[in-house]
């Protein structure tokens, strides 16, 4: 801000000059005093000049509706929405979200730092304020091949970018707790830059949590219980209450939120797909859930706004107060939270559920060409097992956590696994797509329920190799080949024919289409997965499959290097 701009702001605030816009007759949510005040909001040059008695030529009568600060999602992966940053902005802003803190570690695992560059540039084309975090753990583990390896040395330049707010969720909590040199060097990169560090510490407690928090890792979104939440708050951390498309802890953790500790609580979605946004909303849905759970509505709005701003050092937003960004949400009530209008930097961006700006998309060519699959053939899907029993990946309710089970299997005369009709054990394979290694790891999956054909994805956390499940090797190979041909996404095959697909040309992770198109495609994919291929009715076919390669979530998962026991932190044999 220059001298003239500051003088004008002060003059408007004092009433000597006319604002650009006045929102009249609003019930203004005062997040500092946890109250509602009646007044007009004066806006000039994208900033709030004051709350009080103002007038100008350009006035909007709020008619007694509630004006709240713009909502801030404190942790989200844009890639998991399956749409581009520009499109996610179009979907989120009408629900009152004006800022998101995004961790692009999915695309970084595929494209490396050029993936971060793409996300930064694409995000500039949306009115939504996207604050990028620098991915901290690429790859997430050394037990798989990813498209990049970002070490501390490579982090030193991007951590200084104005567009990079801090260091993304630090999933390598064992490395922090045990003081591993390479891990400590990454933490120091952020500390030297004076930027915050986002956390990820599921199940960590006691002295281990002390060790993790001592590195001044400031947040955690992985709490499963109120006790874990309270322990983290006691260690000086902020706790993110999550309500997304895949994982939820909001209702559970709200039971532990009090007027005393609520200012250490923030909202996040983590992963949020178009269907969820279009049917339920975003942080406005968090607020409705808070109302259902009996949480004071002003306290809930603090968690959606000022708490996140203070946690991440965003001193220019989070409240309706003089000198702050004019990011304002007008809504009908503090319980129903139906968003009517949204301003970002004083400009009306959404009105009655409609995103107003024209969408201009960034070029995606830098994110394409990420399928380097060497010598793949149906023969690589054969699975010889020398014992009549095998370790299988058993899907538990929720579709993310698995258990290690031993089951009797069907084999042919060459000791190769054969799918038995009526037996809920099928082949699952991970095909390496980044480094031309030719790796194809095959294992067994239980609880998915597929009875015909195959499903292949290029979204497979966290390294995003190709993952495929099926009852027939030929169909599995057909699905993999079709997936490569369409530059990634989702493919369903039955009888060597593609019965449904969704191309995702942005790194094999995101569609270049609108959210409504993605929702319709996913609805069709889910329907055909259940009705044509026979996937169990209680299994979300895409989300469940994409987590079967995530080697940091117990108990066993499959990477391109083999069957991995997360508890033992080592590979195990299929034979039991």
Swiss-Prot record:
Its cofactor is Mn(2+). GO terms for biological process: adenine catabolic process. Pfam families: Adenine_deam_C (PF13382), Amidohydro_1 (PF01979). It is an enzyme of class 3 (hydrolase). The keyword Manganese applies. It catalyses: adenine + H2O + H(+) = hypoxanthine + NH4(+). InterPro entries: Adenine_deam, Adenine_deam_C, Amidohydro-rel, Metal-dep_hydrolase_composite, Metal_Hydrolase. Its EC number is 3.5.4.2. Keywords: Hydrolase, Manganese. GO terms for molecular function: adenine deaminase activity. SUPFAM superfamilies: Composite domain of metallo-dependent hydrolases, Metallo-dependent hydrolases. It comes from the Bacteria. Belongs to the metallo-dependent hydrolases superfamily. Adenine deaminase family. This is Adenine deaminase 2. It comes from Desulfotalea psychrophila (strain LSv54 / DSM 12343).
């Amino acid at each position: 801000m220059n001298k003239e701009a500051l003088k004008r702001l002060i003059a408007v605030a004092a009433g000597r000059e006319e604002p650009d816009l006045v929102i009249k007759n609003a019930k203004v949510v005062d997040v500092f005093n946890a109250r509602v005040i009646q007044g007009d909001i004066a806006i000039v040059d994208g900033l709030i000049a004051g709350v009080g008695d103002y007038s100008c030529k350009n006035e909007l009568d709020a008619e007694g509706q509630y004006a709240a600060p713009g909502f801030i999602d404190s942790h989200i992966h844009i890639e998991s929405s399956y749409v581009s940053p520009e499109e996610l902005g179009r979907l989120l802003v009408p629900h009152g979200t004006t800022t998101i803190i995004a961790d692009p570690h999915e695309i970084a695992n595929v494209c490396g730092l050029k993936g971060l560059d793409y996300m930064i540039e694409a995000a500039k084309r949306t009115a939504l304020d996207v604050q990028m975090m620098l991915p901290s753990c690429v790859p997430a583990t050394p037990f798989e091949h990813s498209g990049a390896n970002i070490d501390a040395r490579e982090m030193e330049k991007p951590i200084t970018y104005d567009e990079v707010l801090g260091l993304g969720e630090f999933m390598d909590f064992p490395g922090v707790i045990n003081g591993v040199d390479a891990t400590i060097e990454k933490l120091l990169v952020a500390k030297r830059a004076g930027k915050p560090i986002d956390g990820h510490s599921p199940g960590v407690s006691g002295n281990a949590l002390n060790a993790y928090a001592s590195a001044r890792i400031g947040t955690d979104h992985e709490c499963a219980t109120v006790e874990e939440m309270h322990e983290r708050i006691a260690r000086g951390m902020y706790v993110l209450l999550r309500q997304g498309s895949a994982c939820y802890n909001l209702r559970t953790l709200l039971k532990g939120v009090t007027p005393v500790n609520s200012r250490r609580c923030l909202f996040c979605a983590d992963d949020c797909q178009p269907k969820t946004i279009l049917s339920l909303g975003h942080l406005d849905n968090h607020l409705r859930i808070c109302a259902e759970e009996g949480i004071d509505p002003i306290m809930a709005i603090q968690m959606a706004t000022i708490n996140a701003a203070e946690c991440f050092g965003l001193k220019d937003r989070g409240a309706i107060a003089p000198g702050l960004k004019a990011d304002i949400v007008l809504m009908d009530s503090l319980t129903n939270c139906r968003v009517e209008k949204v301003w970002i930097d004083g400009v009306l961006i959404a009105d009655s559920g409609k995103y107003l700006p024209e969408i201009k998309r960034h070029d995606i060519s830098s994110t394409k060409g990420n399928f380097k699959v060497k010598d793949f053939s149906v023969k690589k899907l054969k699975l010889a097992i020398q014992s009549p029993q095998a370790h299988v990946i058993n899907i538990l309710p929720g579709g993310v956590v698995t258990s290690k089970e031993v089951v009797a299997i069907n084999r042919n005369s060459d000791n190769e696994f054969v799918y038995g009709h009526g037996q809920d054990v099928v082949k699952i394979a991970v095909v390496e797509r980044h480094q031309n290694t030719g790796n194809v790891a095959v294992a067994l999956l239980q609880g998915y329920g597929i009875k015909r054909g195959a499903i292949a994805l290029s979204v497979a956390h966290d390294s995003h190799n190709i993952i495929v499940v099926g009852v027939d090797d030929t169909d599995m190979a057909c699905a993999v080949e079709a997936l490569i041909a369409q530059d990634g996404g989702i493919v369903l095959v039955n009888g060597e024919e593609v019965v449904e697909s969704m191309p995702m040309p942005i790194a094999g992770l995101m569609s270049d289409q609108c959210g409504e198109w993605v929702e319709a495609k996913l609805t069709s994919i889910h329907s055909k997965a259940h009705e044509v291929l026979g996937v169990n009715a209680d299994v979300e076919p895409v989300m469940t499959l994409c987590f079967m390669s995530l080697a940091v979530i117990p108990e066993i998962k499959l990477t391109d290097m083999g069957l991995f026991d997360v508890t033992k932190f080592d590979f195990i044999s299929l034979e039991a």
